[in-house]
Amino acid sequence: MFQKALWLRTYQQSKYVVWLFWLVSFYSLSYKYYMTSIQQQHFLNDNKKWNYVYHYHFDLTLLDPIMLLGSILTILACTLIGWERQNNASDLLWSMPFKRSHLYITKWLFGICNIAAVVILNWGLFAIMKRLTFHNKYQVFSPFHSYFIYMLIVLIAIYTLALCVGTITGNIISQGFLTVVIFIFPLLLPPLISGVIAVHSNVDFHEKNGRIHDVMENIRISSPAEDFTINFNYDPQSAYTDQNGVRHNEPNFTKIPPAKTLIAPIAHILILLPLGIYLYARSANERNGNYLLYPKLQKIVLVCAIFFGGIVGGLILSHEQSLPSFYIGFLVTSFITYFFLPKILKWKVSWNFK
């Protein structure tokens, strides 16, 4: 797994995506942080010029860079597994004197090293710029430690998920699509369940949503990033009391989710990494190019797609929680999915260039 030839081949296969990941990370994090300091300095000079009262404001969310960088990491994982399956490059790779498990671990470690390097470098640049720029007068750096730790864990979990999905899919399209579906499914499940309850019991659509959302929060990879906000605001009018009765006075209005939210992404890493190694070592090359490598899994995906697709169609077509219109939409959408999806899953995608 530490063979130089494997690492060089992995880099050559994905170098453009890797460089895109580095450039986007520095632009969306360090560059924007620096430009914000220049902007605030400019506001201060303008306020002094016009004798206005200056209010320093800085706001940084974790979810936005997670979604942006996570998307690129998904493309990276698709490039390392889905692309080589699609153009049959895996046949040559697996004929080399390397264990399949070592090939997979090399791909995983390659991505993890890039993630760790990017996060640590941006972490250090933030610390340097905070001390040397206008931010130093108004910020404390302690929230940024949690910010980058949470970012590191969540990005590793997203990459691990995308790579693991590549062990059950046969081309780059299905790997990317299925990764997105699995990632957002815990976000969509609460409104789907509460919507069905509302249609059948005339209970308010959002009444049951909170409890289901709390359950899904414990299994979502993105859970640690969803409510993470670093906010420095020197405006006394922004002081408030949160839902737990804690008084937040200016200037630091930072909101950091509890550490227990990290359990979900860490659990995904611990489960999906060995699962991915196991499945990759037993992948069937003869089904490369198909949307799914395992026929039994294809049946499960088909059943789930018909069922949940029907629910979505029923909720869209139901009017004012009308039960008949819900079932009409459910049956129509399920039939359309049942008719077209098996035909799509039989397609085989194969490109003969590398």
Which residues does each PLM region occupy?
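Hydrophobic alpha-helical transmembrane segments
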Residues: 1-85, 255-260, 272-325, 333-354
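Helix-loop-helix units of permease transmembrane domains in multi-pass membrane transporters
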Residues: 80-116
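Individual transmembrane alpha-helix segments
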Residues: 240-268
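Extended amphipathic alpha-helical segments with heptad-repeat/coiled-coil character used for oligomerization
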Residues: 192-216
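Alpha-helical transmembrane segments of polytopic membrane proteins
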Residues: 62-64, 143-155, 259-267, 324-335
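Secretory targeting signals
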Residues: 51-62, 110-179, 187-196, 202
